[in-house]
Amino acid sequence: MSGITKPVNLYSVAELRNATDDALPLALSKLGYEQSFSLIDTKLAIGYVATILAGSLYYLEKKYNNDFSNLTYYYSMVALVVGYFALNGLLWLHGKYREKDIKYVGINKNNQKKISIEARVENNTTPIYKVTVIENNRLLGKQDIPFTGIFDEDGFIHIDQLVEIFTRLLQEKEK
Amino acid sequence: MNIRQQLVQLLNLAMVLSTAFMFWKGLGLVTNSNSPIVVVLSGSMEPAFQRGDILFLWNRDKYVDIGDVVVYEVKGKPIPIVHRVLREHKVTNKDRKVRQLLLTKGDNNPTDDLSLYAHKSNYLDRDEDVLGTVKAYLPKVGYVTILITENKYAKLGLLGLMALSTLLTRE
């Protein structure tokens, strides 16, 4: 639960954003949402499989003494290198088209509706947290949250304020 | 901090290392050389190459030419040597396979490389011994690796810095 017990540097937009990203699961659990980890788990799975490929090539290199004239070694090297970069490409596509700016995915315990929260900052000098909430692939609402509204002067994040903002954002659709 | 966040950080570190390694291997496959980039360690090719120059090798030519600078490795001696091809012979084997045999010499050395070759061998074999022909070079940049290989504190320091920076940044 870093970012909640630890103050952040208020002059660093990156730190503010990270702390807010980290606080999202807690804020939404207070609103009755359970976090779904499928996006990050996919990313971890692809990434670690790729790392294992690289690791096994390292092992083969030692085992065969990096001898290119050994065809077993040569063709496993081709396969592992191609596989590694294919998985990296997949990881890139996953990050660009599925994960995008999504910082939180959760399922409402009452009505089983799935929400995704995309959040980003424009650049490192604009301390505004741009939030988009999507419910079951339908745009629910957008809001620009200035970091001054959720952090106090000492750099502590205030979960209650974040909860309040999301309560409003999530209620808008019910009208 | 939750377990997934830590796994992501660890993955980032692993990705930096593994991508560097796989690029190296990929470059090896493209150039068909098991050591496609080497650093000059001795002054035997001065003034063409100085200690610390980085050489880029290419090993897809069937034969090397006289005058080419090649990198070769003698069996049993693990250090690659960068020298110029002085003479060549093409020998046809019984199985009609043509072997190219080479004699090399360092530009800055008084004699040719006969004394450097493997025991009782008076030539290099193009296919078996040569790692590649030098196609491009970057002067002096490789001095960092000489520093790292010859000074263990420099090596540890650099590794430590790399590990720290990947673990601490989250951008």
Curated annotation (Swiss-Prot), chain B:
It is a single-pass type II membrane protein. The active site is at S44, H83, D113. Keywords: Endoplasmic reticulum, Hydrolase, Membrane, Protease, Signal-anchor, Transmembrane, Transmembrane helix. Its main location: endoplasmic reticulum. Residues 25-171 are lumenal. It catalyses: Cleavage of hydrophobic, N-terminal signal or leader sequences from secreted and periplasmic proteins. GO terms for biological process: signal peptide processing. It is an enzyme of class 3 (hydrolase). The keyword Amino-acid biosynthesis does not apply. Residues 157-168 are annotated as: C-terminal short (CTS) helix. GO terms for molecular function: serine-type endopeptidase activity. Residues 1-6 are cytoplasmic. Its EC number is 3.4.21.89. InterPro entries: LexA/Signal_pep-like_sf, Pept_S26A_signal_pept_1_CS, Pept_S26A_signal_pept_1_Ser-AS, Peptidase_S26, Peptidase_S26B. Component of the signal peptidase complex (SPC) composed of a catalytic subunit SEC11 and three accessory subunits SPC1, SPC2 and SPC3. The complex induces a local thinning of the ER membrane which is used to measure the length of the signal peptide (SP) h-region of protein substrates. This ensures the selectivity of the complex towards h-regions shorter than 18-20 amino acids. SPC associates with the translocon complex. Catalytic component of the signal peptidase complex (SPC) which catalyzes the cleavage of N-terminal signal sequences from nascent proteins as they are translocated into the lumen of the endoplasmic reticulum. Specifically cleaves N-terminal signal peptides that contain a hydrophobic alpha-helix (h-region) shorter than 18-20 amino acids. NCBIfam families: sigpep_I_arch (TIGR02228). This is Signal peptidase complex catalytic subunit SEC11. It comes from Komagataella phaffii (strain GS115 / ATCC 20864) (Yeast).
